[in-house]
């Protein structure tokens, strides 16, 4: 990585309302990019978060958790309006969770904190979820990808949420524009099913690998993950676990994938095209992190020690 070695994550931060009983919800800090930043911090990666955060009680909690996880929140904008909300319907390892978002008139709605010259302060930029294609936030994310230059790398996770993104015909070109610019891309088989109905997800993922990224990774829930690069395909199964909650599992996978890449010198200045051995190692690490997250309630990404213990390397 470049001299500062920072991974900058940009996107939404919100509060997940997760059902605990029929009429009881628990407020849990979340948002896909936010979870990814927290996960990176817990894995020991120097991380910054560029998001729009409220000054209300929940916004203060979001900032506090970033700090506790070793993430620099100084790239973010603080807004006096309330924190955005997401009502979560729990899923299984096969189906994943479902979300209903409440974003209007909240801190989410406003100018992007992501500046075009971000590469002067960070080695790698990760963008993701609906904020990467939504209005002014999405436009800023696209400009940021375009401005990466030769000394920085980028990654993108579309994390499609059908009930918050525009119709497919409008969303697909925006997603593909970002795929073409990103160094690395991660998406789920559900993302591909929604974006390309009737096309096998593996075929769509292989097609993305030909659009420009060095690597495309597709997660398949309880079936593991696949990687596409240099015309090759690597398949890595997931371990058998007792699933408690799938919320945040994909974000834990993303953060662990980036952490493993950083360790192998695949982020920032001097980043190289990955080898088959490296990609296999990255998938194992990311799948282990996601599996740990599925064994506990809420988006709770693991620490490096927890992942190492599962892999037998700690």
Regions found by a protein language model. Give the residues of each.
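Short beta-strand scaffold segments in enzyme catalytic cores
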Residues: 38, 85-89, 224-228
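Short glycine-enriched, charge-decorated loop/helix-capping segments at active-site entrances
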Residues: 22-27, 104, 272-273
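Conserved phosphate-binding/catalytic region of the ribokinase-like
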Residues: 1-6, 197-314
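General beta-strand structural signal in soluble alpha/beta enzymes
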Residues: 9, 75, 154-156, 186-187, ...
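Proline-centered loop/turn at the N-terminus of a beta-strand
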Residues: 6, 46, 153, 184, ...
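Conserved beta-alpha-beta core of the PfkB/ribokinase-like small-molecule kinase fold
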Residues: 124, 129-206, 223-225
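Glycine-rich phosphate/adenosyl-contacting loop at the front of the ribokinase-like
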Residues: 1-71
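Conserved N-terminal subdomain of the carbohydrate kinase-like
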Residues: 46-129, 154, 311-314
